[in-house]
Amino acid sequence: MKKQIFSTLVLSIGILLPFSLHSQEQRKKVGVVLSGGGAKGMAHIKALKVIEEAGIPIDYIAGTSMGAIVGGLYAIGYTTEQLDSMVRKQDWTFLLSDRIKRSAMSLTDRERSEKYTVSIPFTKTPKDAAAGGLMKGQNLANLFSDLTVGYHDSINFNKLPIPFACVAANVVNGEQIVFHDGILSTAMRASMAIPGVFTPVRQDSMVLVDGGIVNNYPADVVKAMGADIIIGVDVQNALKKADKLNSVPDILGQIVDITCQSNHEKNVDLTDTYIRVNVEGYSSASFTPAAIDTLMRRGEEAAKEQWNSLLALKKKIGIAEDYTPKQHGPYSSLSNARTVYVTDITFSGVEVDDKKWLMKKCNLKENSDITTQQIEQALYQLRGSQSYSSASYTLTDTPEGYHLNFLLQAKYEKRINLGIRFDSEEIASLLINGTADLKTHIPSRLSLTGRLGKRYAARIDYTLEPMQQRNFNFSYMFQYNDINIYEEGERAYNTTYKYHSGEFGFSDVWYKNFRFGFGARIEYFKYKDFLFKKPEFTMNVNSEYFISYFAQLRYNTFDKGYFPSKGSNFSGAYSLYTDNFARYNGHAPFSAL
Protein backbone atom coordinates (compact mmCIF):
# COMPACT_ATOMS: atom_id res chain seq x y z
CA MET A 1 0.00 0.00 0.00
CA LYS A 2 2.81 2.40 0.96
CA LYS A 3 4.60 1.60 -2.26
CA GLN A 4 1.43 2.36 -4.20
CA ILE A 5 0.98 5.76 -2.48
CA PHE A 6 4.65 6.65 -3.03
CA SER A 7 4.43 5.72 -6.72
CA THR A 8 1.31 7.87 -7.09
CA LEU A 9 3.07 10.91 -5.49
CA VAL A 10 6.14 10.54 -7.69
CA LEU A 11 3.95 10.25 -10.78
CA SER A 12 1.94 13.33 -9.76
CA ILE A 13 5.09 15.43 -9.19
CA GLY A 14 6.51 14.22 -12.48
CA ILE A 15 3.34 15.30 -14.27
CA LEU A 16 2.87 18.66 -12.49
CA LEU A 17 6.51 19.83 -12.49
CA PRO A 18 6.82 20.25 -16.28
CA PHE A 19 3.55 22.20 -16.26
CA SER A 20 4.97 24.48 -13.55
CA LEU A 21 8.24 25.01 -15.39
CA HIS A 22 6.41 25.50 -18.68
CA SER A 23 4.23 28.21 -17.14
CA GLN A 24 7.34 30.05 -15.90
CA GLU A 25 8.99 29.83 -19.30
CA GLN A 26 5.84 31.07 -21.01
CA ARG A 27 6.19 34.62 -19.74
CA LYS A 28 7.16 37.08 -22.43
CA LYS A 29 10.74 38.32 -22.67
CA VAL A 30 11.48 41.96 -21.83
CA GLY A 31 14.10 44.04 -23.59
CA VAL A 32 15.38 47.47 -22.53
CA VAL A 33 16.80 49.91 -25.06
CA LEU A 34 19.01 52.85 -24.01
CA SER A 35 19.61 55.67 -26.48
CA GLY A 36 22.81 57.57 -27.11
CA GLY A 37 23.27 61.09 -25.87
CA GLY A 38 26.66 61.58 -24.24
CA ALA A 39 26.39 63.00 -20.74
CA LYS A 40 22.60 62.99 -21.04
CA GLY A 41 22.84 59.20 -20.84
CA MET A 42 23.43 59.53 -17.09
CA ALA A 43 19.62 59.59 -16.90
CA HIS A 44 19.59 55.90 -17.90
CA ILE A 45 20.90 54.86 -14.50
CA LYS A 46 17.96 56.16 -12.48
CA ALA A 47 15.47 55.07 -15.14
CA LEU A 48 16.76 51.50 -14.78
CA LYS A 49 16.33 51.82 -11.03
CA VAL A 50 12.63 52.68 -11.44
CA ILE A 51 12.13 49.75 -13.84
CA GLU A 52 13.61 47.48 -11.16
CA GLU A 53 11.35 48.99 -8.48
CA ALA A 54 8.33 48.27 -10.66
CA GLY A 55 9.25 44.58 -10.53
CA ILE A 56 9.87 44.26 -14.27
CA PRO A 57 12.37 41.54 -15.28
CA ILE A 58 15.01 42.53 -17.83
CA ASP A 59 15.95 39.74 -20.24
CA TYR A 60 17.81 41.71 -22.93
CA ILE A 61 19.47 45.09 -23.12
CA ALA A 62 20.74 47.07 -26.11
CA GLY A 63 22.24 50.54 -26.36
CA THR A 64 24.10 53.06 -28.43
CA SER A 65 26.96 55.34 -27.35
CA MET A 66 26.43 56.25 -23.67
CA GLY A 67 23.50 53.85 -23.69
CA ALA A 68 25.96 51.11 -24.70
CA ILE A 69 28.24 51.97 -21.78
CA VAL A 70 25.48 52.00 -19.16
CA GLY A 71 23.82 48.97 -20.75
CA GLY A 72 27.04 46.97 -21.05
CA LEU A 73 27.99 47.53 -17.42
CA TYR A 74 24.45 46.77 -16.25
CA ALA A 75 24.51 43.56 -18.32
CA ILE A 76 27.59 42.19 -16.51
CA GLY A 77 26.06 42.78 -13.11
CA TYR A 78 26.59 46.40 -12.10
CA THR A 79 23.68 47.56 -9.96
CA THR A 80 22.16 51.00 -10.41
CA GLU A 81 23.72 51.97 -7.06
CA GLN A 82 27.17 50.90 -8.29
CA LEU A 83 26.71 52.81 -11.55
CA ASP A 84 25.54 55.90 -9.66
CA SER A 85 28.60 55.80 -7.41
CA MET A 86 30.96 55.11 -10.30
CA VAL A 87 29.91 58.03 -12.52
CA ARG A 88 29.89 60.52 -9.65
CA LYS A 89 33.44 59.81 -8.53
CA GLN A 90 35.02 60.11 -11.99
CA ASP A 91 37.08 63.10 -13.10
CA TRP A 92 35.29 63.49 -16.44
CA THR A 93 37.50 66.35 -17.59
CA PHE A 94 40.49 64.02 -17.30
CA LEU A 95 38.68 60.98 -18.74
CA LEU A 96 37.52 62.85 -21.85
CA SER A 97 41.07 63.88 -22.69
CA ASP A 98 44.33 62.16 -23.53
CA ARG A 99 46.14 63.89 -20.68
CA ILE A 100 48.61 61.90 -18.64
CA LYS A 101 48.87 62.44 -14.91
CA ARG A 102 51.80 64.72 -14.18
CA SER A 103 53.22 62.26 -11.65
CA ALA A 104 53.65 59.67 -14.43
CA MET A 105 55.26 61.99 -17.00
CA SER A 106 58.98 62.22 -17.57
CA LEU A 107 60.63 65.48 -16.57
CA THR A 108 61.16 66.34 -20.25
CA ASP A 109 57.47 65.88 -21.06
CA ARG A 110 56.44 67.87 -17.98
CA GLU A 111 58.61 70.77 -19.11
CA ARG A 112 57.14 70.57 -22.61
CA SER A 113 53.54 70.49 -21.36
CA GLU A 114 54.16 73.53 -19.15
CA LYS A 115 55.79 75.50 -21.94
CA TYR A 116 53.02 75.14 -24.53
CA THR A 117 49.36 76.02 -24.19
CA VAL A 118 48.16 74.24 -27.34
CA SER A 119 49.36 70.92 -28.76
CA ILE A 120 47.91 69.67 -32.06
CA PRO A 121 48.80 66.29 -33.62
CA PHE A 122 49.22 66.10 -37.36
CA THR A 123 49.18 62.89 -39.32
CA LYS A 124 51.81 61.04 -41.26
CA THR A 125 49.56 59.42 -43.86
CA PRO A 126 46.20 60.13 -45.54
CA LYS A 127 44.90 56.96 -43.86
CA ASP A 128 45.46 58.51 -40.44
CA ALA A 129 43.88 61.77 -41.52
CA ALA A 130 40.73 60.08 -42.80
CA ALA A 131 40.23 58.13 -39.61
CA GLY A 132 41.41 60.65 -37.11
CA GLY A 133 39.95 62.43 -34.18
CA LEU A 134 41.04 65.08 -31.76
CA MET A 135 41.51 62.49 -28.99
CA LYS A 136 42.36 58.81 -28.80
CA GLY A 137 40.08 58.33 -25.81
CA GLN A 138 42.90 56.51 -24.03
CA ASN A 139 41.79 57.41 -20.50
CA LEU A 140 38.20 56.42 -21.23
CA ALA A 141 39.29 53.13 -22.80
CA ASN A 142 41.39 52.32 -19.75
CA LEU A 143 38.40 53.04 -17.51
CA PHE A 144 36.32 50.57 -19.54
CA SER A 145 39.05 47.95 -19.06
CA ASP A 146 39.07 48.59 -15.31
CA LEU A 147 35.29 48.31 -15.12
CA THR A 148 35.06 45.06 -17.10
CA VAL A 149 37.67 42.90 -15.39
CA GLY A 150 36.55 39.31 -15.83
CA TYR A 151 35.23 40.01 -19.34
CA HIS A 152 38.47 40.82 -21.18
CA ASP A 153 38.36 37.73 -23.39
CA SER A 154 36.51 37.70 -26.68
CA ILE A 155 33.11 36.48 -25.50
CA ASN A 156 29.54 35.91 -26.63
CA PHE A 157 27.47 38.81 -25.24
CA ASN A 158 24.39 36.56 -25.20
CA LYS A 159 26.07 34.63 -22.37
CA LEU A 160 26.42 37.65 -20.09
CA PRO A 161 24.22 37.77 -16.96
CA ILE A 162 21.85 39.80 -19.16
CA PRO A 163 22.25 39.28 -22.94
CA PHE A 164 23.59 42.52 -24.43
CA ALA A 165 24.15 44.20 -27.79
CA CYS A 166 25.43 47.62 -28.84
CA VAL A 167 25.55 49.57 -32.08
CA ALA A 168 28.42 51.19 -33.95
CA ALA A 169 28.67 52.60 -37.48
CA ASN A 170 31.16 51.49 -40.12
CA VAL A 171 32.22 54.66 -41.93
CA VAL A 172 33.69 52.60 -44.78
CA ASN A 173 30.20 51.82 -46.11
CA GLY A 174 27.81 53.56 -43.69
CA GLU A 175 26.40 50.29 -42.39
CA GLN A 176 25.16 49.62 -38.89
CA ILE A 177 27.35 47.16 -36.97
CA VAL A 178 25.70 45.35 -34.06
CA PHE A 179 28.08 43.83 -31.52
CA HIS A 180 26.84 40.50 -30.14
CA ASP A 181 30.32 39.24 -29.30
CA GLY A 182 33.93 40.35 -28.99
CA ILE A 183 35.80 42.19 -26.25
CA LEU A 184 33.19 44.09 -24.24
CA SER A 185 35.30 47.19 -23.52
CA THR A 186 36.23 47.49 -27.22
CA ALA A 187 32.59 47.23 -28.29
CA MET A 188 31.59 49.99 -25.85
CA ARG A 189 34.51 52.17 -26.99
CA ALA A 190 33.50 51.73 -30.65
CA SER A 191 29.87 52.60 -29.94
CA MET A 192 30.82 55.97 -28.41
CA ALA A 193 33.63 56.99 -30.82
CA ILE A 194 32.14 60.39 -31.70
CA PRO A 195 33.40 61.29 -35.22
CA GLY A 196 35.99 64.06 -35.19
CA VAL A 197 36.27 63.96 -31.39
CA PHE A 198 37.52 60.45 -30.61
CA THR A 199 39.59 58.36 -32.98
CA PRO A 200 37.59 55.45 -34.43
CA VAL A 201 38.10 51.80 -33.57
CA ARG A 202 39.65 49.79 -36.39
CA GLN A 203 38.55 46.17 -36.53
CA ASP A 204 39.36 43.94 -39.48
CA SER A 205 38.45 46.05 -42.54
CA MET A 206 36.01 48.24 -40.61
CA VAL A 207 36.46 51.76 -39.24
CA LEU A 208 33.94 52.05 -36.42
CA VAL A 209 32.47 55.23 -34.94
CA ASP A 210 29.57 56.26 -32.72
CA GLY A 211 26.47 54.23 -33.57
CA GLY A 212 24.31 57.30 -33.01
CA ILE A 213 24.82 58.36 -36.63
CA VAL A 214 22.92 55.28 -37.87
CA ASN A 215 20.72 54.05 -34.99
CA ASN A 216 20.65 56.07 -31.81
CA TYR A 217 17.64 54.28 -30.33
CA PRO A 218 18.12 50.58 -31.26
CA ALA A 219 14.73 49.11 -30.35
CA ASP A 220 14.90 46.98 -33.50
CA VAL A 221 18.13 45.43 -32.22
CA VAL A 222 16.67 44.37 -28.87
CA LYS A 223 13.58 43.02 -30.64
CA ALA A 224 15.77 40.92 -32.93
CA MET A 225 17.48 39.53 -29.83
CA GLY A 226 14.15 38.00 -28.80
CA ALA A 227 12.33 40.68 -26.81
CA ASP A 228 8.53 40.48 -26.88
CA ILE A 229 8.06 43.58 -24.71
CA ILE A 230 10.29 46.64 -25.14
CA ILE A 231 10.93 49.42 -22.63
CA GLY A 232 12.88 52.35 -24.03
CA VAL A 233 14.72 55.24 -22.40
CA ASP A 234 15.39 58.11 -24.80
CA VAL A 235 17.65 61.03 -23.88
CA GLN A 236 17.87 62.69 -27.29
CA ASN A 237 17.08 66.36 -27.76
CA ALA A 238 14.17 67.39 -29.93
CA LEU A 239 15.01 69.00 -33.28
CA LYS A 240 16.20 72.57 -32.77
CA LYS A 241 14.33 75.63 -34.01
CA ALA A 242 15.98 78.04 -36.44
CA ASP A 243 17.02 80.48 -33.71
CA LYS A 244 18.92 77.69 -31.92
CA LEU A 245 21.03 76.69 -34.93
CA ASN A 246 23.84 79.18 -34.43
CA SER A 247 27.01 77.13 -34.83
CA VAL A 248 28.57 74.49 -37.08
CA PRO A 249 28.22 71.73 -34.40
CA ASP A 250 24.52 72.65 -33.98
CA ILE A 251 23.89 72.37 -37.72
CA LEU A 252 25.88 69.14 -38.15
CA GLY A 253 24.10 67.59 -35.17
CA GLN A 254 20.73 68.61 -36.62
CA ILE A 255 21.63 67.02 -39.97
CA VAL A 256 22.48 63.71 -38.24
CA ASP A 257 19.22 63.85 -36.23
CA ILE A 258 17.16 64.48 -39.38
CA THR A 259 18.92 61.62 -41.20
CA CYS A 260 18.12 59.21 -38.35
CA GLN A 261 14.60 60.56 -37.69
CA SER A 262 12.73 58.05 -39.85
CA ASN A 263 14.54 55.09 -38.29
CA HIS A 264 14.03 56.60 -34.83
CA GLU A 265 10.27 56.93 -35.31
CA LYS A 266 10.01 53.30 -36.45
CA ASN A 267 11.90 52.17 -33.36
CA VAL A 268 9.70 54.26 -31.06
CA ASP A 269 6.69 52.51 -32.61
CA LEU A 270 8.20 49.17 -31.53
CA THR A 271 8.34 50.34 -27.91
CA ASP A 272 5.68 49.29 -25.40
CA THR A 273 6.69 51.76 -22.67
CA TYR A 274 8.54 54.81 -23.96
CA ILE A 275 10.40 56.88 -21.35
CA ARG A 276 11.34 60.26 -22.85
CA VAL A 277 13.65 62.19 -20.53
CA ASN A 278 13.55 65.99 -20.44
CA VAL A 279 17.15 66.98 -21.25
CA GLU A 280 16.42 70.63 -22.08
CA GLY A 281 19.35 72.83 -21.16
CA TYR A 282 21.91 70.04 -21.29
CA SER A 283 24.19 68.68 -24.00
CA SER A 284 26.32 65.65 -24.68
CA ALA A 285 29.20 67.41 -22.90
CA SER A 286 27.36 68.23 -19.65
CA PHE A 287 29.62 66.21 -17.35
CA THR A 288 29.74 68.61 -14.39
CA PRO A 289 28.67 67.17 -11.00
CA ALA A 290 25.61 69.43 -10.93
CA ALA A 291 24.57 68.41 -14.46
CA ILE A 292 25.01 64.70 -13.70
CA ASP A 293 22.90 65.05 -10.57
CA THR A 294 20.11 66.87 -12.46
CA LEU A 295 20.12 64.45 -15.40
CA MET A 296 19.87 61.46 -13.08
CA ARG A 297 16.98 63.07 -11.23
CA ARG A 298 15.21 63.81 -14.51
CA GLY A 299 15.72 60.20 -15.61
CA GLU A 300 14.04 58.99 -12.44
CA GLU A 301 11.19 61.49 -12.81
CA ALA A 302 10.59 60.51 -16.46
CA ALA A 303 10.47 56.81 -15.56
CA LYS A 304 8.07 57.44 -12.66
CA GLU A 305 5.77 59.33 -15.02
CA GLN A 306 5.41 55.98 -16.83
CA TRP A 307 4.87 54.06 -13.56
CA ASN A 308 1.32 52.98 -14.42
CA SER A 309 2.45 51.92 -17.87
CA LEU A 310 5.25 49.85 -16.33
CA LEU A 311 2.86 48.13 -13.92
CA ALA A 312 0.42 47.45 -16.76
CA LEU A 313 3.20 45.63 -18.61
CA LYS A 314 3.19 42.87 -15.99
CA LYS A 315 -0.07 41.50 -17.36
CA LYS A 316 1.29 41.61 -20.93
CA ILE A 317 4.48 39.92 -19.78
CA GLY A 318 2.52 37.22 -18.00
CA ILE A 319 3.66 37.77 -14.42
CA ALA A 320 1.76 38.45 -11.22
CA GLU A 321 1.45 41.97 -9.80
CA ASP A 322 3.59 40.94 -6.81
CA TYR A 323 6.22 39.29 -9.03
CA THR A 324 9.79 39.91 -7.87
CA PRO A 325 12.59 39.45 -10.42
CA LYS A 326 15.70 37.59 -9.37
CA GLN A 327 18.30 39.82 -7.74
CA HIS A 328 20.52 41.70 -10.17
CA GLY A 329 24.24 41.97 -9.34
CA PRO A 330 26.20 43.29 -7.65
CA TYR A 331 29.22 43.14 -9.92
CA SER A 332 32.24 42.06 -7.91
CA SER A 333 34.70 44.44 -9.52
CA LEU A 334 38.42 44.45 -8.91
CA SER A 335 38.56 47.45 -6.60
CA ASN A 336 41.74 49.32 -5.75
CA ALA A 337 41.92 47.47 -2.45
CA ARG A 338 41.24 43.97 -3.81
CA THR A 339 44.03 41.85 -5.24
CA VAL A 340 44.30 39.09 -7.81
CA TYR A 341 47.14 36.65 -8.20
CA VAL A 342 48.99 37.30 -11.47
CA THR A 343 51.09 34.42 -12.71
CA ASP A 344 52.60 36.01 -15.80
CA ILE A 345 52.91 39.45 -17.39
CA THR A 346 53.41 40.05 -21.11
CA PHE A 347 53.84 43.11 -23.32
CA SER A 348 52.43 43.21 -26.86
CA GLY A 349 53.87 45.58 -29.44
CA VAL A 350 57.39 45.85 -27.96
CA GLU A 351 60.77 44.26 -28.47
CA VAL A 352 61.41 41.17 -26.35
CA ASP A 353 64.54 42.77 -24.89
CA ASP A 354 62.47 45.64 -23.48
CA LYS A 355 60.44 43.43 -21.11
CA LYS A 356 62.96 43.60 -18.26
CA TRP A 357 63.03 47.40 -18.36
CA LEU A 358 59.24 47.61 -18.64
CA MET A 359 58.73 45.31 -15.66
CA LYS A 360 61.04 47.51 -13.63
CA LYS A 361 59.32 50.70 -14.77
CA CYS A 362 55.85 49.30 -13.99
CA ASN A 363 57.04 48.04 -10.60
CA LEU A 364 55.17 44.77 -11.12
CA LYS A 365 56.23 41.19 -10.45
CA GLU A 366 55.00 37.91 -11.83
CA ASN A 367 53.58 35.33 -9.41
CA SER A 368 52.38 38.05 -7.04
CA ASP A 369 49.20 39.80 -5.90
CA ILE A 370 48.36 42.93 -7.92
CA THR A 371 45.57 45.51 -7.57
CA THR A 372 43.80 47.63 -10.16
CA GLN A 373 45.50 50.68 -8.68
CA GLN A 374 48.91 49.17 -9.44
CA ILE A 375 47.84 48.33 -13.00
CA GLU A 376 46.49 51.87 -13.47
CA GLN A 377 49.77 53.37 -12.24
CA ALA A 378 51.68 51.07 -14.60
CA LEU A 379 49.58 52.33 -17.55
CA TYR A 380 50.32 55.94 -16.63
CA GLN A 381 54.03 55.13 -16.36
CA LEU A 382 54.05 53.50 -19.79
CA ARG A 383 52.13 56.35 -21.44
CA GLY A 384 54.30 58.86 -19.58
CA SER A 385 57.47 57.46 -21.13
CA GLN A 386 58.66 58.91 -24.42
CA SER A 387 58.40 55.52 -26.14
CA TYR A 388 54.67 54.67 -26.22
CA SER A 389 51.72 56.71 -27.42
CA SER A 390 49.07 54.38 -26.02
CA ALA A 391 48.88 51.66 -23.41
CA SER A 392 45.99 49.40 -22.44
CA TYR A 393 45.68 46.02 -20.79
CA THR A 394 43.73 42.79 -20.56
CA LEU A 395 43.43 40.65 -17.44
CA THR A 396 42.28 37.12 -18.20
CA ASP A 397 41.61 34.29 -15.79
CA THR A 398 43.54 31.02 -16.05
CA PRO A 399 43.50 27.90 -13.84
CA GLU A 400 46.78 28.99 -12.20
CA GLY A 401 45.84 32.67 -11.77
CA TYR A 402 45.44 35.78 -13.92
CA HIS A 403 47.39 36.61 -17.06
CA LEU A 404 48.14 40.34 -17.39
CA ASN A 405 48.93 41.59 -20.89
CA PHE A 406 49.84 45.19 -21.72
CA LEU A 407 49.09 46.32 -25.28
CA LEU A 408 51.49 49.08 -26.27
CA GLN A 409 51.78 51.21 -29.38
CA ALA A 410 55.14 52.73 -30.24
CA LYS A 411 55.12 56.50 -30.30
CA TYR A 412 55.64 57.81 -33.82
CA GLU A 413 53.82 61.09 -33.38
CA LYS A 414 54.09 64.46 -35.02
CA ARG A 415 52.79 67.47 -33.15
CA ILE A 416 52.59 71.23 -33.52
CA ASN A 417 52.90 73.03 -30.17
CA LEU A 418 52.08 76.67 -29.50
CA GLY A 419 52.84 78.86 -26.52
CA ILE A 420 52.27 82.55 -25.87
CA ARG A 421 53.73 84.92 -23.29
CA PHE A 422 52.69 88.39 -22.18
CA ASP A 423 54.86 90.70 -20.06
CA SER A 424 55.61 94.39 -19.61
CA GLU A 425 59.01 94.11 -21.30
CA GLU A 426 58.24 92.41 -24.62
CA ILE A 427 54.46 92.90 -24.51
CA ALA A 428 53.92 89.56 -26.30
CA SER A 429 55.95 86.70 -27.74
CA LEU A 430 54.92 83.52 -29.53
CA LEU A 431 56.61 80.12 -29.25
CA ILE A 432 56.09 77.64 -32.11
CA ASN A 433 57.37 74.08 -32.01
CA GLY A 434 57.15 71.06 -34.28
CA THR A 435 58.15 67.66 -32.89
CA ALA A 436 58.29 64.34 -34.73
CA ASP A 437 59.10 60.85 -33.43
CA LEU A 438 61.02 59.16 -36.22
CA LYS A 439 60.86 55.52 -37.34
CA THR A 440 64.61 54.89 -37.23
CA HIS A 441 66.53 51.77 -36.17
CA ILE A 442 67.38 53.55 -32.93
CA PRO A 443 64.33 55.49 -31.63
CA SER A 444 64.84 59.17 -32.32
CA ARG A 445 63.06 62.51 -32.19
CA LEU A 446 63.44 65.72 -34.19
CA SER A 447 62.26 69.02 -32.75
CA LEU A 448 62.21 72.49 -34.33
CA THR A 449 61.38 75.55 -32.23
CA GLY A 450 60.95 79.21 -33.14
CA ARG A 451 60.32 82.22 -30.92
CA LEU A 452 58.72 85.36 -32.36
CA GLY A 453 58.97 88.62 -30.48
CA LYS A 454 61.35 91.38 -29.53
CA ARG A 455 63.90 88.71 -28.63
CA TYR A 456 63.56 86.15 -31.40
CA ALA A 457 65.18 82.72 -31.46
CA ALA A 458 65.38 79.39 -33.28
CA ARG A 459 66.44 75.96 -32.06
CA ILE A 460 66.82 72.47 -33.51
CA ASP A 461 67.15 69.29 -31.42
CA TYR A 462 67.84 65.74 -32.51
CA THR A 463 67.60 63.05 -29.84
CA LEU A 464 68.62 59.40 -29.98
CA GLU A 465 67.36 56.93 -27.38
CA PRO A 466 69.44 53.71 -27.69
CA MET A 467 68.16 52.53 -24.30
CA GLN A 468 64.97 53.32 -22.44
CA GLN A 469 65.19 56.65 -20.60
CA ARG A 470 68.80 57.18 -21.73
CA ASN A 471 69.40 59.49 -24.65
CA PHE A 472 71.94 61.46 -26.60
CA ASN A 473 70.94 64.94 -27.71
CA PHE A 474 72.42 67.16 -30.43
CA SER A 475 71.20 70.75 -30.60
CA TYR A 476 71.84 74.12 -32.17
CA MET A 477 70.30 77.38 -31.01
CA PHE A 478 70.33 80.97 -32.24
CA GLN A 479 69.06 83.91 -30.19
CA TYR A 480 68.80 87.63 -30.74
CA ASN A 481 68.78 89.44 -27.39
CA ASP A 482 67.80 93.01 -26.60
CA ILE A 483 68.34 93.53 -22.88
CA ASN A 484 67.77 96.49 -20.58
CA ILE A 485 69.87 96.75 -17.41
CA TYR A 486 68.31 98.60 -14.47
CA GLU A 487 69.82 100.39 -11.49
CA GLU A 488 67.57 101.46 -8.62
CA GLY A 489 64.50 100.94 -10.78
CA GLU A 490 65.78 103.02 -13.71
CA ARG A 491 67.21 101.76 -16.96
CA ALA A 492 70.98 102.30 -16.90
CA TYR A 493 71.91 100.85 -20.28
CA ASN A 494 70.80 98.60 -23.10
CA THR A 495 72.68 95.96 -25.03
CA THR A 496 71.92 93.84 -28.07
CA TYR A 497 73.79 90.74 -29.16
CA LYS A 498 73.45 87.54 -31.16
CA TYR A 499 74.03 84.20 -29.50
CA HIS A 500 74.91 80.88 -31.16
CA SER A 501 75.15 77.59 -29.30
CA GLY A 502 75.95 74.01 -30.35
CA GLU A 503 75.59 71.24 -27.81
CA PHE A 504 76.09 67.51 -27.42
CA GLY A 505 74.78 65.88 -24.26
CA PHE A 506 73.89 62.60 -22.60
CA SER A 507 70.91 62.33 -20.26
CA ASP A 508 69.90 59.50 -17.93
CA VAL A 509 66.67 59.24 -16.00
CA TRP A 510 67.46 57.12 -12.96
CA TYR A 511 64.03 57.78 -11.48
CA LYS A 512 60.92 59.39 -12.95
CA ASN A 513 61.39 62.58 -10.89
CA PHE A 514 65.16 62.75 -11.27
CA ARG A 515 67.30 63.50 -14.32
CA PHE A 516 71.08 63.67 -14.65
CA GLY A 517 73.00 64.81 -17.71
CA PHE A 518 76.40 65.93 -18.93
CA GLY A 519 77.96 67.06 -22.18
CA ALA A 520 79.91 69.68 -24.09
CA ARG A 521 78.85 73.02 -25.53
CA ILE A 522 80.25 75.66 -27.89
CA GLU A 523 78.89 79.22 -27.45
CA TYR A 524 79.49 82.35 -29.49
CA PHE A 525 78.44 85.86 -28.42
CA LYS A 526 78.42 88.57 -31.08
CA TYR A 527 77.86 91.90 -29.34
CA LYS A 528 76.44 94.79 -31.33
CA ASP A 529 75.57 97.86 -29.26
CA PHE A 530 75.86 99.13 -25.71
CA LEU A 531 73.71 102.22 -25.12
CA PHE A 532 74.14 104.09 -21.84
CA LYS A 533 71.74 106.54 -20.21
CA LYS A 534 74.71 108.81 -19.47
CA PRO A 535 76.43 109.67 -22.78
CA GLU A 536 79.87 109.98 -21.16
CA PHE A 537 79.88 106.24 -20.50
CA THR A 538 81.20 104.10 -23.37
CA MET A 539 82.18 100.47 -23.67
CA ASN A 540 83.73 98.41 -26.44
CA VAL A 541 83.14 94.69 -26.07
CA ASN A 542 84.62 92.21 -28.49
CA SER A 543 82.75 89.15 -29.61
CA GLU A 544 83.80 85.98 -27.81
CA TYR A 545 83.28 82.25 -27.76
CA PHE A 546 83.47 79.52 -25.13
CA ILE A 547 83.99 75.77 -25.22
CA SER A 548 82.54 74.34 -22.05
CA TYR A 549 81.83 71.05 -20.31
CA PHE A 550 78.76 70.77 -18.15
CA ALA A 551 76.94 68.50 -15.74
CA GLN A 552 73.41 69.11 -14.53
CA LEU A 553 70.75 67.43 -12.47
CA ARG A 554 67.13 68.11 -11.61
CA TYR A 555 64.67 66.70 -9.12
CA ASN A 556 60.99 67.70 -9.27
CA THR A 557 57.92 66.32 -7.51
CA PHE A 558 55.59 69.34 -7.85
CA ASP A 559 51.93 68.36 -8.27
CA LYS A 560 51.46 71.27 -10.73
CA GLY A 561 53.82 73.16 -12.98
CA TYR A 562 52.43 76.53 -11.90
CA PHE A 563 51.27 77.40 -8.39
CA PRO A 564 52.03 73.93 -6.92
CA SER A 565 50.51 73.04 -3.56
CA LYS A 566 52.84 70.17 -2.71
CA GLY A 567 56.11 68.62 -3.78
CA SER A 568 59.66 69.89 -4.06
CA ASN A 569 62.03 71.06 -6.77
CA PHE A 570 65.81 71.16 -6.99
CA SER A 571 68.10 71.85 -9.91
CA GLY A 572 71.82 72.37 -10.17
CA ALA A 573 74.42 72.78 -12.91
CA TYR A 574 78.18 72.98 -13.11
CA SER A 575 80.10 74.26 -16.16
CA LEU A 576 83.82 74.43 -16.90
CA TYR A 577 84.70 77.09 -19.52
CA THR A 578 87.66 77.07 -21.94
CA ASP A 579 88.45 78.57 -25.31
CA ASN A 580 90.57 75.67 -26.63
CA PHE A 581 89.11 72.60 -24.88
CA ALA A 582 91.71 72.80 -22.07
CA ARG A 583 92.53 76.39 -21.08
CA TYR A 584 91.00 79.84 -21.25
CA ASN A 585 93.01 82.80 -22.55
CA GLY A 586 96.24 80.99 -21.74
CA HIS A 587 95.21 80.34 -18.15
CA ALA A 588 93.36 77.66 -16.25
CA PRO A 589 89.70 77.30 -17.23
CA PHE A 590 87.09 78.98 -15.05
CA SER A 591 83.93 77.39 -13.75
CA ALA A 592 80.39 78.35 -12.86
CA LEU A 593 78.00 76.64 -10.47
Locate each region found by the language model:
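Bacterial Sec-dependent N-terminal signal peptides
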Residues: M1-K28
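Patatin-like phospholipase
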Residues: L21-T64, G72-Y380, G384-A391, L395-T396, ...
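Short, glycine/acidic-rich beta->alpha junctions
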Residues: D210-V214, K454, K498, A588-F590
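Short beta-strands and strand-coil junctions in structured, solvent-facing domains, enriched
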Residues: S154, A238-L239, S389, Q468-Q469, ...
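A short, Trp-centered hydrophobic/proline-enriched beta-strand micro-motif
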Residues: C166-A168, F516, F570
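Gram-negative/organellar outer-membrane beta-barrel architecture
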Residues: Q373, A378, G384, S392-F558, ...
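Extended beta-strand-rich architecture
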Residues: R554, P564-K566, F570-L593
